[in-house]
Amino acid sequence: MKAKYVFPSDYMADPAANVFDGKLYIYPSHDYDSGECFDDDGGHFQMKDYHVLCIDGDPMEQDAKDCGKQFGIEDIPWVEKQLWDNDCVEKDGKYYLIYSAKDYTGVFHLGVAVADKPEGPFVPEADPIRGSYSIDPCVFKDDDGEIYVYFGGIWGGQLQWYKDNKMLKAEHLPEGKEDPLPSRVARMTGDVKQFAEAPRAVIIVDETGKPLPADDPHRFFEASWMHKYNGKYYFSYSTGDTHLLCYAVGDNPYGPFTYQGVILEPVVGWTTHHSIVEYKGKWYLFHHDCVPSNDTTWLRSLKVAELEYDAEGHIKTVK
């Protein structure tokens, strides 16, 4: 399953691929060299604007087209810096881009921007989503029309500072056989601008129903993604410091999700972030690596590979 670069003319990462109006749209973060030094909290990822990419043909043959800059830090009153991952969903002819960014107190929140077309232009709301925190939103529209946002990331994503949706006085990173820090999920309001409920923990369990422990190399770290296949809910994610993309399967949007296996083995570069989408009868994995930038971890390039399932619905590992 050979992968190809999607947009070789610029550094883009964290691709959220969606199909709207028969076209493939990609909502990435936009890397650039800010001059910041590498640190474990991601201070070297100083992205300052968002672009939308589009493909109307075979993504394994055609490069993506840049639909242009959508908005930047200067357009969002509550944001100081670091426009990180984003995703988009359609409802009633409107398009809602949910993104993560850091406010003037150094805390990450989720924001919403709205457009009349999937390619934009997107206009950001003046305030973040109430009760939101951390990073890496994935917006999932279920078959019944309900919309959910999955989010969360450890270390620079600040998830270790929260418990029961409240900020702690001191961070806590679970170790050993402790329960790991989970992703979060919340159903959205009808206008797709606020949480309709308090975020819940997304629990990943083994085949016996026991949660994966904090020291398991396949536990959640960041980069939540949700898709459905044959009526099942596939929750996929990055393991962060073990550099894998893994997945787990459940029977509803909230889980629990039973761990299944590895989707993508480690790539060149520290981060691994992805999306999975069906387009024109084929399934695709979008992700990124740092080969074109000679392993500069904050200068990443988008890639795509065909994704295959076996007869039992297991995803075949992309090597």
Curated annotation (Swiss-Prot):
Family from the record: Belongs to the glycosyl hydrolase 43 family.
EC number annotated for this UniProt entry: 3.2.1.37
UniProt organism field: Xylanibacter ruminicola
Catalytic residues (positions): D14, E222
Encoding gene per record: xynB
Reaction(s) this enzyme catalyzes, per UniProt: Hydrolysis of (1->4)-beta-D-xylans, to remove successive D-xylose residues from the non-reducing termini
Protein name as catalogued: Beta-xylosidase
InterPro entries (UniProt xref): Glyco_hydro_43, Glyco_hydro_beta-prop_sf, Glycosyl_Hydrlase_43_Enz
Domain of life: Bacteria
